[in-house]
C-alpha cells in the first residue's frame, strides 16, 4: 500500500465519482490539469469547464513531493508537459513510470512532438519499453517515422530501478 497517492483530475463530475469510489485517507484527489498552459477549458458531455492548471514542478512543490515510487500518467496530451527536459532529472529518480502518449490530433502536432520526444527525451532513460494498446512491443517500430502514422496512442513503460 502506498503511503500517499495523488490523483489529478480536471473534470469536476469525475472528482465526485473518484471520491465515492476511492474513499481512502491516503488518496488525495486534486481538481486540475498538469500542463504548462496558464488556463485550459475542457468540453465534456456538452459542458465547458475552466480547469485550474499547474506545471509538474508547481504540483511537486505545492504538495511537497520529493519522492515518487510509481508514476502513472494519462494526461490526454498533457504528458508532453510532464516529460520535458526541465523535469528529466527528477523523472529519472522515479523507479517505475507508465504513461500514455497521444499521437492523434488534427494537424499532426502530437506526432511531431512525439518524434522529438522519441529522439531527445527517451534516449535519456536506460530501460524503456513502448507498447501499442493491444500489448504489442513496438519500441523498434517507433524509431521508423513511417510506423508512427499507424498509431493514435502508445503506452510507455520506464523502469529506472538500479
Task: Mark where each language-model region is.
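Phosphate/nucleotide-binding beta-alpha loop and adjacent structural elements of enzyme active sites
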Residues: 1-162
Amino acid at each position: 500500500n502506498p503511503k500517499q497517492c495523488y490523483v489529478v483530475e480536471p473534470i469536476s463530475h469525475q472528482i465526485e465519482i473518484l471520491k465515492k469510489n476511492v474513499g481512502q485517507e491516503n488518496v488525495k484527489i486534486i481538481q486540475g490539469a498538469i500542463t504548462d498552459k496558464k488556463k485550459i477549458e475542457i468540453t465534456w458531455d456538452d459542458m465547458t469547464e475552466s480547469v485550474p492548471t499547474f506545471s509538474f514542478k508547481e504540483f511537486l512543490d505545492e504538495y511537497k513531493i520529493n519522492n515518487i515510487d510509481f508514476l502513472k500518467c494519462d494526461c490526454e496530451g498533457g504528458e508532453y508537459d510532464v516529460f520535458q527536459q526541465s523535469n528529466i532529472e527528477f523523472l529519472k529518480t522515479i523507479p517505475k513510470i507508465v504513461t500514455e502518449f497521444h499521437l492523434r490530433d488534427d494537424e499532426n502536432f502530437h506526432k511531431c512532438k512525439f518524434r522529438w520526444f522519441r529522439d531527445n527525451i527517451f534516449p535519456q532513460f536506460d530501460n524503456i519499453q513502448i507498447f501499442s494498446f493491444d500489448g504489442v512491443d513496438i519500441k523498434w517500430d517507433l524509431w521508423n517515422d513511417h510506423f508512427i502514422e499507424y498509431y493514435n496512442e502508445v503506452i510507455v513503460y520506464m523502469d529506472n530501478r538500479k
